Structure formats: C-alpha cells, structure tokens
Amino acid sequence: MTTPPLPYLDPSHLTAALRDTGYALLRPDDVALLAGCSLPDLATLVPSWDRLELDDYLKDGGRYRRRRHSCFIDDGASLVQTPHRAHWQPVEYNALHGGMHRLFAPMETATVANPAWERLLRALGAACSAVTPAQPWFVEAHQFRIDTADGIGRPTPEGAHRDGVNFVAVIMIGRHGIKGGETRVFDADGPSGQRFTMTEPWTLLLLDDAAVIHESTPIQPLGEHGYRDTLVLTWRAGSFQGENV
C-alpha cells in the first residue's frame, strides 16, 4: 500500500494556512530555516530525551510516558524562563487529567541554555504573533517520550482535544521500533480534517488551538525498547493556565 505524501506547506504560506485552515505542517529543513539554525544544531537538543522522568499522574494506570516541563515568557525581544511551576488544564480541555496541578521534572539547564532552543522558541513565537499579535506569550514546553514497554503507549490518552491556549506546536523528535502514532487534526466545528504520520525528526505541526482539535493514535512495538519522542509547545496570551487557581 502506498503511503500518501504528508501535507507539507511552504513556510511562506505559514501565516495564511493558520488563518485559513488552523494548522500547518513544515518539513524539517524548513523548521531549521525558520529557526535560523541547522538541523545538526537542533539535533544537539535530542540527547536530553534519554533523561526524561516518569509521569506519575496517568489516570489510566500506565507507566508508558516520560516527560519534562518548563515555562517561559516571550515578549518579542527576549525569552525568559519562569520559576518552575505546575502544569494545569481545566477539565473542559482535558477530561482525564484536567483540574489538577501536575508538577513534572523541569527541563535540564543545559537544554534551555542551548542556543538552538531559544532560536526555535522565538522563531515559532514570532510565527504565532504574525497570526495573533498578543505578546507577551506565556509558553509551556513539554518533552515527551511514549514507550511500548507494556505493549501499547498512548501519546494522547485524553483523546482528541484542544489545549485551551492560542497555539500548539507538535514537533517530531524521533521514533524507534514502533508502528502507529498517526497524527489527526480535525476542524473544531466539523468533520473535515487530515491524518498523517510524522516520521522525520524535526517535522513540525503548528495548530491554531481554537480552530482545530488534535490527537495521536496509540503506538505498538515492532521490537524491544520501542518509543516515540516529541516536543510539544504551547503559546497562550494573558497568563499561564491555572495561574490563579
């Protein structure tokens, strides 16, 4: 069976696509170009995914997710990491894990200090501002590893969802020894949408969170030690979610 080509977008159409369809998918080379660095520069961030901490908050009883989480404020001139804080979502956006403060391990200092990290986040923040000029942005960064040690790993155990922010980026970091993990993006108010499987490291999906819902299907092992690594970034105007809860 022939795999259909991914719906990649020319980066010059990024702003228009987010306004018109609510999402945009960029090739790895274009992500590096947007960030003003090389793919080898971005690759220097990848080893930190081998040092994520177990997510103890999964309500489905699973132990298939490892993660780190940190927060930043992007005012257009600088990107500043905030003191470490818990991640919070309302139950309206996360029926499984909403309504609870989840304090995850912070991102490693060396990862945040890597010049490629700031370049990537500031470039994507500028892309968000081109659609919605709402700086400062309150940015949350989530490093994820979903593994198949227990047979099945669920990238989005909460199902198809929105995140309650302005924009969401899902970046493929790597896949090893798995099948599945299909990404699905649908109109928030209708049945139309896209489904595709991101396989190349640094493929980027950028979403207008108010316009679309998204999910990734479970992964299954093709051998031992299967996993799927992603970086999820969110941008929200006004404040972090849960700041006054």
Role assignments for model-derived ranges:
Residues 29, 74-76, 142-144, 172, ...:
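Structured loops at beta-to-helix junctions and adjacent beta-edge loops in soluble globular domains
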Residues 20, 163-166, 200-201, 227:
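Short, well-ordered loop/turn elements at secondary-structure boundaries
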Residues 131-198:
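Catalytic core of non-heme Fe(II) oxygenases with the double-stranded beta-helix
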Residues 1-91:
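N-terminal auxiliary "cap/dimerization" subdomain that precedes the catalytic jelly-roll/cupin core
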Residues 182-245:
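Catalytic core of Fe(II)/2-oxoglutarate
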Residues 25, 143, 168-170, 204-206, ...:
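Conserved hydrophobic/aromatic beta-strand scaffold that supports enzyme active sites
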Residues 74-140:
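Signature of the catalytic double-stranded beta-helix
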Residues 3-9, 134-155, 203-216:
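Generic detector of solvent-exposed, compositionally biased contiguous segments
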